[in-house]
Amino acid sequence: MTTLRDLYPEIEPYASGRLEADEIHSLYWEECGNPKGIPVVFLHGGPGGGCSATSRRYFDPARYRVVLFDQRGAGRSTPNGELRNNTTAHLIVDLETLRKSRGIDAWHVFGGSWGSTLALAYAQDHPEACLSLTLRGIFLMREWEIRWLFEAGRKFRPEAWEALLDALPPELREGDPLEGYAKLLDHPDHAVRLSAARRWSVFEATLANLIPDSTRIAGASEEQVAYAMARIEVHYFRNNRYEPEDQLLRRVERICHVPATIVQGRYDLLCPPITAIQLHRAWPGSRLIIVDDAGHSATEPGIRSALVTVMDEIATQ
């Protein structure tokens, strides 16, 4: 029987700071592990999710120099939940600015969920900066993938779906929930915005694990987390789709030479496995690992084990 790998022990950053991205956004970054180690950048999900202490623990701290940053409006970056100057293109520029400011010639890129979207977009624009890609829970920002979020909730977590709809005023319940939440999250009353943000964030957290994780769900309702996640995610879903929508698949040829591993939960309700399979088939030389007893979250035991194992393998190459 295969023994599952656990995360590395908790670790504190040896350096942290802020990147003044523009006149609006101040981005939090940190480094942990070995300052002279193999550089890897962690790209969090959402968009709007932010990094956590757990994000540091997929990498051997003796061998990796781990760079983490909270994307625009997320986590410890400010202003919280800010939508101005917040697009995929802005985040790609931020990544390059951060890499150069930290004196890194090229790095390994590690991202899951929305982090996989950003990793692909970044690598396709800057392949020379990417030593490898390790991706989990693939999301390509296509219309049907966005709609799948609601379909999965309605069909597999009906209680969570009903709670999501209950937050909408009666006149918005029959329409597109994405547009309904966009209205609530832009409401002039902060209390209305925050209540809607919590409903949205909790709904998504309920779908993240094969068996819903009460700790994750409780954390999703925390004010700063929920506000950034809901506002930024709805903003991106409405305004930052690709044209053509399969652009990230079409441009894989730009990074075919970059080593890639794709880790995907078989029962992922947020990012269904077909997307990971399509990416793998479009990317000659990529490796696909399907974890049969897992949902979406990187903390699912099988996914966690696969990610730690992959990063250990990269460190020994």
Give residue spans per PLM region.
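Conserved hydrolase catalytic core segment
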Residues: 105-144
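N-terminal cap/lid segment of alpha/beta-hydrolase-fold proteins
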Residues: 5-28, 233
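Short beta-strand/loop motif that positions the catalytic acidic residue
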Residues: 255-256, 262-264
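A catalytic-pocket lid/entrance helix-loop region that shapes and gates access to the active site
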Residues: 128-180
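Conserved HGGG/HGGXW glycine-rich cap/lid loop of the alpha/beta-hydrolase fold
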Residues: 21-79
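Conserved alpha/beta-hydrolase "acid-adjacent" motif
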Residues: 269-275
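Catalytic active-site module of serine/aspartate enzymes centered on a nucleophile-bearing elbow/loop
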Residues: 286-317
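Conserved acidic catalytic loop of the alpha/beta-hydrolase fold
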Residues: 89-107
